[in-house]
């Protein structure tokens, strides 16, 4: 679908430069009134130029911060254990008076999640550890995050593991590379979380949100 691809391209490639660079470019394009636009990246525009520019105009304004303090909790879960942690952390975030947006990365659109992260004040990334690594959907999401856009956001990682649990420290390192504020060593449990683990996950979510 053309518009779905156009939106995906905007979110992952153009979005980080939406203000002021994209807005200035749109203004210049409208002043020049070109019959064709040949960008250095992306499709050539030879029809529907005004429609595309209008869409870009609107999308440039979509990343205004959420009115209430918000934490995006984006996760992938192999056996449901990391999902249980995510749900409890969301409860804890809400206990602290903040909003929690839960995204299962196997179902949610990457562009939608990235856009929500751009508007939120906090981010929790969740993944189990398989073959000593976090799972691909989480890494795919981080490829749409940029220091220029997301630096300074409060962020951490969590997950269930069976053996060595490298997913959480690997994700924390990526969050630091994005120049986000990483306040701790994340949260991880071995295999299926116990009731004590779930209570601790809820408390972790609350403590995290109180730092926003």
Q: For each predicted feature, which ranges?
A:
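FMN-binding flavodoxin-like domain, especially the glycine-rich phosphate-binding loop
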Residues: 1-44, 49-50, 62-63, 70, ...
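N-terminal beta1-alpha1 ligand-phosphate binding loop
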Residues: 75-81
